[in-house]
Amino acid sequence: MPRLKRDDLPDAATQTAIRGRGILCPFSSAAEARMVKHILVAHDLSPDADLALRRAAQLARQCNAQLSLAHVCEADEQAAGEQLQAHLDQLGLDDVRLWLRPGPTVEGLLTLAGGIEADLLVLGRHHRQSPQGFAGTTLERILLATPIPLLLVTHPAIEPYRQALAALDYSRCANRALHAAWQLLPPEAKLHALNIEEVAEIHGADPAALALQVELFGQLIDDTRTALGADEGRLSYSLHQGERLNCLDAAISELQPQLLALGGHSRSELSHALLGSLTRHFFDNPPCDVLVAR
């Protein structure tokens, strides 16, 4: 898997041509880097939802954010509310606002998220038993419709996140995902941004193309570090050539992140009604908690 660092740069003429193209970081730092102030966790009375609640509670404490718990159902609201309140009391979460909403899950949850101005939506892996996996589930419909980042929690919140990995390209949604992930990390945690120049592995590496990509991506990372106030020790990066999934799987194996951040759109971003293949793959087979922004 070919890999270059920024020391391996194009020649002077190529660098001049790159700068002349006016490559800019495609996001508004003020909007993308906003702090997490209100976390909404959806709970369906399942063990998977308990994982999400515990992680959301840890993040709320870390970020000094308000935590709300939502249950949307068409059955007995009172019984569900009593069960959830007892569960919150058992966990010692006495400062959590409990919301009970009737009606369709997706509409009820997203309407509530907008009404309380939530910055982050947290869910468990409710589609684990679905024969179709992630496809066609309530979780997929929520992800397709939510305007705020969504965190899929799959592992126990034993400790704060220590290592995050962001698949970063030049799309706005990938940049939003990286910024959202950064806000969920404590000061001692690290984030690694991975850029992949997709080529068929049978064709081998193209050193000239990869060197050009190093310069472009390096500019993006410099802008991102400035926006986040991050240094090289906390926000690192690397570039790879190869097939996207293979490169990302290799990075996950090497870094062992507790959090994976992805942009939610298809690569063309032509349609907000489409999800990228990487997002679908990792929601079906999450190696860790997965954060998606659209």
What are these regions (language model features)?
Residues 4-8, 16-28, 32, 108-158, ...:
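Gly/Ser-rich helix-loop-strand patches that form or flank binding pockets
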Residues 68-70, 97-101, 151, 194, ...:
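General small-molecule cofactor/ligand-binding pocket signal
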Residues 88-94, 227-232:
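Short helix-capping segments at alpha-helix termini
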Residues 100-108, 239-246:
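Charged docking surfaces used in two-component/phosphorelay signaling
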Residues 133-134, 177, 202-206, 247-250, ...:
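Short, well-ordered secondary-structure micro-motifs
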Residues 210-262:
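Glycine/small-residue-rich hydrophobic helix-like segments
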